[in-house]
Design a protein with these regions (language model features):
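Acyl-donor-binding surface of acyltransferase catalytic domains
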Residues: 1-2, 86-179, 313-317
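Short loop/turn microsegments at loop-to-beta-strand junctions
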Residues: 7, 49-51, 223-225
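Short loop/turn motifs at secondary-structure junctions and domain boundaries
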Residues: 43-47, 217-222
Length: 319
């Protein structure tokens, strides 16, 4: 399969590290971890189909492309397409070729709408996508929190949140300290409920428990760093920081609160515990990202001292 002058072949597990290196080369300020990439490739989501390809020039790897979609459980069939090229070989023609190839495969699978992402400061990619007919659909806000500069503020917020949780008889603890044998099942159900209320254009598809546990066992997560909130028998919420084992910045993997836990300050309490733990572990900064219309969590980020980074833009076009 060709993409401009690039030859595409099916990706193999051992190519995951190359893709992490490619993404890191494109945005050195946002290094990606090859260990996490490889684990993600080895443990696909059973509710989705994904195809990955490596692009070569004269036998040398220079590009990556993919197309993925859920198992068509929603009324509108959204196909995710993407790809990129190493900086030295990155041209509009090659990017355009990658999207042409992936759109063709996605369309053949039955996609009705293509969706992809670009950073707001990636002019070349945005120009290519605009010429292909893509239009901005929504944005993802990206943030960074300086744990050194904001330590005093965060300590005060954490103390206030702990008191508020005590007053409401809500227990906040890491999941390794929870002796409930059903804790992961309850966490999975709560997370699915919380995810349904996150603003989105592409509908959320409830994930299987087996896929959830693959994620819980992924290299960046540890049970002693997964914070949950409980009210008696119920799991109300969760907040998790991912710690890249090889390279990268510590960042939020997921913060979610079920409907029974909202309006109680649970999300703030959980996020405070994750960052206080990060400080104790010697981390100097953490990052997070949220949908641009998720007002409650955006407000928490602002009050904690997070500062904006470039947005991610979701773009769509008809197939």
């Amino acid at each position: 399969m060709k993409a401009a002058d690039i030859t595409l072949r099916e990706a193999r597990i051992e190519d995951a590290a190359f893709v992490a290196d490619l993404d890191t080369a494109l945005r050195p300020e946002d290094p990606q971890d090859p260990v996490i990439y490889e684990d993600y490739w080895r443990n696909p989501d059973e509710s989705s189909k994904v195809e990955r390809f490596i692009g070569e020039l004269e036998g040398t790897r220079v590009a990556y492309a993919s197309q993925r979609h859920t198992n068509w459980k929603t009324s509108t069939r959204y196909g995710g397409v993407g790809g990129d090229v190493l900086p030295a070989q990155r041209t509009p023609e090659r990017l355009d070729g990658l999207f042409t190839a992936m759109e063709d495969r996605s369309r053949a699978d039955g996609a009705q709408t293509f969706t992809t992402w670009a950073w707001e400061d990636d002019d070349l990619r945005l120009q290519v996508l605009t010429k292909r007919g893509y239009r901005e659909e929504r944005r993802q806000r990206f943030w960074e929190l300086d744990l050194v500069a904001n330590r005093a503020k965060l300590e005060a917020m954490a103390a206030a949140s702990r008191e508020k949780m005590r007053e409401q008889h809500i227990t906040v603890l890491t999941i390794d300290r929870d002796d409930d044998p059903e804790k992961f099942t309850k966490l999975w159900r709560m997370s699915n409920e919380a995810e349904q209320d996150v603003p989105t254009t592409v509908p959320h598809v409830e994930g299987a428990f087996e896929d959830f546990m693959k994620w819980m066992r992924s290299p960046g997560l540890r049970e002693d760093r997964i914070w949950i909130a409980r009210d008696g028998d119920r799991v109300l919420g969760v907040s998790i920081l991912s710690y890249p084992p090889k390279r990268g910045v510590v960042q939020t993997d997921w913060t979610g609160v079920g409907r029974a836990g909202r309006g109680k300050g649970v999300a703030r309490a959980l996020k405070c515990e994750t960052v206080m733990q990060a400080i104790a572990l010697g981390v100097d900064k953490v990052r997070t990202d949220n949908d641009f219309k998720n007002a409650p969590i955006l407000h928490i980020n602002d009050t904690m001292g997070y500062r904006r980074r470039p947005d991610g833009i979701q773009l769509m076009r008809g197939a």
